[in-house]
Regions:
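Aromatic-lined carbohydrate-binding/catalytic grooves of carbohydrate-active enzymes
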Residues: 155-237
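Catalytic and substrate-binding clefts that recognize carbohydrates or anionic sugar/phosphate headgroups
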Residues: 1-158, 168-169, 174, 181-186
Length: 237
């Protein structure tokens, strides 16, 4: 079962592809608080989700933020990394019904997943304009399946994207890229793609190319492709 609740005037994000009617009744499972929501967790419940985040697969016992911002340092004590995936899956150890929580909101969301109180999950959005989806199912796998149906299937990457990639920060010139390809070939190593970080840009601005250091990015890409190597420039957005 999927229920949708709307608060304020949510900004359209196109994150959801299914038409789910807005539920008028009270929000089940959750308790409204002054700045968000609380959920009472079973003692051995496991909490999955939030995408690429610090710590382990079970998110219980820490607090997090999702805000789509650069994080220059990675470590166990960080509150977030780059991306925002505002989906939680709560799986009770006793085999009772599993619950999925999806917050459709493009801004900052804060989570306290058993950090302040081991038995309490709390979350709050920076603004009171968002859509909240609750998904219930007998198993965690079924919750995940229904969530995927809600947001639509992922794109299918090209076959070469499953190959070997050489990626690092610090390739400053076209010559650096060509040298990487040459050294792989000289050492008899397979190479399917070279990923470039922000050094190829003009003043680190998206959708720009530093013409002094990369005078002809189109030709560089074509030359590498002729060798069976794809050039993958980062878009730091």
């Amino acid at each position: 079962m999927i229920q949708r609740f709307r608060f304020g005037l949510p900004l359209p994000t196109d994150s959801v592809v299914q038409e789910i009617p807005v539920s008028a009744g009270p929000v089940p499972f959750l308790t409204a608080e002054e700045d968000g929501w609380a959920y009472r967790m079973a003692p051995d419940a496991i909490v999955y989700g939030l995408g690429e985040m610090p710590r382990g697969i079970n998110k219980r016992g820490w607090h997090y933020e999702t805000n789509n911002t650069d994080e220059s340092e990675h470590g166990e004590n960080r509150l977030s990394y780059y991306a925002a995936h505002n989906f939680l899956l709560i799986s009770p150890a006793d085999g009772s019904e599993c619950i999925g929580i999806f917050i459709d909101f493009p801004g900052k969301v804060s989570y306290d997943i058993g950090y302040t109180r081991h038995d309490t999950l709390r979350f709050a959005t920076a603004e009171p304009n968002y859509a909240l989806y609750l998904i219930t199912a007998p198993t965690a796998a079924e919750v995940a399946k229904r969530f995927r149906q809600l947001i639509g299937p992922s794109y299918i990457p090209p076959k070469w994207a499953f190959g070997l990639a050489q990626s690092r920060f610090g390739y400053k010139t076209e010559a650096d890229i060509r040298e990487v390809a040459a050294q792989y070939k000289a050492n008899g190593l397979p190479l399917d793609m070279i990923c470039m970080d922000i050094e190829y840009m003009q003043d680190y601005a998206d959708f720009t190319v530093n013409k002094e250091r990369f005078p002809d990015l189109t030709k560089l890409s074509a030359d590498l492709k002729a060798q069976g190597i794809r050039l993958v420039p980062i878009i730091d957005a």
